[in-house]
Amino acid sequence: MPALNNSEAGTAEAEPLTRLPFEPITKSHILNCSYDNWHAKYRSSTLKSRIIPLTSEFLSYLREDGIVLPSEIATFPPPETYNNNSTSDGWDEDTDTGPDPSEKFSEIHKQIQETIAELDGSVVPKLNWSAPKDATWISLKQNSMECNTPNDIYLLLKSSDFITHDLEHAFDGCAEDPSITKESTQYVLVLRKWFKVNPSCEFRCFVRDRRIIGICQRDLNYFEFLFPLIPTLREVIQEYFDKTLKDTFPDRNFSFDVYLPDPFDKVRLVDINPWAPRTDPLLFSWLELLTLSVPSPLLGVADSSSVPPLPAQSSDEDEGTDDVEELGWMPEFRLIKKDDPEAYSFSSPQYSAHKMPQEVVEAGASGEGGMREFADNWQRMLNGELEMMGAGEDSDDDDDDDKTTR
């Protein structure tokens, strides 16, 4: 076979990428990253949590349009009257409560109540892969995922696009595998004990070929005090990875999130994420992470990157050592710098695209009457009377001039 001349070879190498060079993403990899599939193995370093397997009835409730909450004593007082000139309190006291949706999943409802009590009354919910971070706008806990009752949890889960993705699109973009389907997946509700998190202490780590190749902040704001701590943080995270995750997680490529509270000497494993475009690379790009040149290990399986090999070690002490690593190479540790554009552009609220349902936008655009009608319907929805969607015609407001067609 004739060899390519230099010009032909150069042309071949210069072909631009038309897509990110991911290996085929398998459904088994997605399942390996499901919380219930790794939590037991790494429980000693995770945050205190409980896992509740979900039934088809509960999943149907999450998938239903609209928001109907079970009857339950509210954990917050009703807001002040929306109309200061009104002689009534603005809330419907003569209600005809509809069927309680929790009757279809009474065992799950009871387990949630018991778990909240076990975890000191405050929890943070998530499903197999995602937490409803995009739905905190609807929470009455000031943009927090803290939940004190089952209804707090249901409201977040049913309002979240991230949760919908877990339920409907978990295996999008994966290679075909008839043995793994959405219907055969065991969905779970994870309830973590709530505590006040310092967002500056959360980090995302990217693993390729069982090696950390990059670490960065999860919260994209500038924290000056972190820069002198980079060597310590990198060492503590690397040591945790080498002892806990490196040889035990079933996939060689993945990312994981950790929390290192002050004094930054102990790692808490928060999550394990797929090595896939759906995972946010944050301060990196996926093209960087996929093509970054990394030295091949002296022993064991070589890294897939095409880089010159390191010279062989001549010391007799190196022979037979299984944990030999390259000297002088460390994973890159990225933080937001004071003058970075990200230090300012990311100071805006996260997940803003998910924060305002169309009904609220339309009610606000309709003026005072529209917002009054929406407030009535919202309170009735919290009382379990009606669905949030399509509730306008049931408003008890007698002033026809104030009604708005939507």
From Swiss-Prot:
Record keyword ATP-binding present: yes
Q: A single GO CC term, please?
A: cytoplasm
- Binding of ATP occurs at 126, 129, 131, 133, 192-195, 202, 204, 218, 257, 271, 273
One GO BP annotation here? eukaryotic translation initiation factor 2 complex assembly
Q: Which residues does the annotation say bind Mg(2+)?
A: 271, 273
Record bears the keyword DNA damage: no
Q: Where in the cell is it found?
A: Cytoplasm
InterPro entries in alphabetical order: CDC123
Lineage: superkingdom: Eukaryota
Report biased composition (Acidic residues) as residue ranges.
393-406
In terms of one coarse class, where is the protein primarily found? cytoplasm
Output one GO MF annotation: magnesium ion binding
Q: What residue spans carry the region label Disordered? A: 78-102, 303-323, 387-406
UniProt keyword terms in alphabetical order: ATP-binding, Chaperone, Cytoplasm, Magnesium, Metal-binding, Nucleotide-binding
Concerning Pfam families, the annotation shows: D123
Q: What does this protein do?
A: ATP-dependent protein-folding chaperone for the eIF2 complex. Binds to the gamma subunit of the eIF2 complex which allows the subunit to assemble with the alpha and beta subunits.
Q: Of which family is this protein a member?
A: Belongs to the CDC123 family.
Name by which UniProt lists this protein: Translation initiation factor eIF2 assembly protein
Q: Which organism is it from?
A: Botryotinia fuckeliana (strain B05.10)
